[in-house]
Amino acid sequence: ALCAAALLRAEPLIRPDRVYLLGHSMGGMLAPRIDAEGGAFAGLIFWAGTPRTLDALILEQNEASLAAMPPEQRAAAAPLVQALREQFAALPRMAEEDAQHTHILGNLWAWYFKEILTHPPEEYLRRLTKPVLVLQGDRDAHLSVERDFRRYEALLAAHPDAAFHLYPGLNHLFMPSPTGAIAE
């Protein structure tokens, strides 16, 4: 994103002071950090993003899936979700070298989660002074209106140039979604 923004600013037909960063989903979660690390963007757009940490979101999604399972499947899957919860809880104490050789969620390296968790999105959101636009569908199966969209509203309540738009009937990809099911 930083390199793409630099290329855009170098284009003679583009006003360098009008380059915005749009992040979708995890990109929306990371956008404030990307900007803080040198983006110099005119503003930020969070499209189906979250102000929560990645581990909290993944655990919530797994627990929701677990709750929706028939009892016999839930009994078999519950230990896997508990193991994931324990892996995430152990990350802050995990040595860097161990994190580089440990997998979480199949083949994802623990160091990735360990690094990303040292940069909570809320810390960056509290420091934002540039324009912010938050967009979310109310049928998003991956996010929560209360825990994500409303949290953005609360965190950015005093921000003079923050706008929020919740779109009825749209899912995570901003497509019409009658029920909000992941399959839609």
Where are these regions (language model features)?
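Alpha/beta-hydrolase active-site loop
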Residues: 1-11
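Alpha/beta-hydrolase fold nucleophile elbow
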Residues: 14-23
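Catalytic nucleophile serine of serine hydrolases
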Residues: 23-25, 48
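Short glycine-enriched nucleophile-adjacent loop
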Residues: 28-39
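Accessory cap/linker subdomain of secreted extracellular hydrolases
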Residues: 43-127
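Short beta-strand/loop motif that positions the catalytic acidic residue
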Residues: 128, 134-136
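Short alpha-helix in the alpha/beta-hydrolase fold that links the catalytic acid
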Residues: 130, 141-155
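Catalytic histidine neighborhood in serine/cysteine hydrolases
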Residues: 156-179
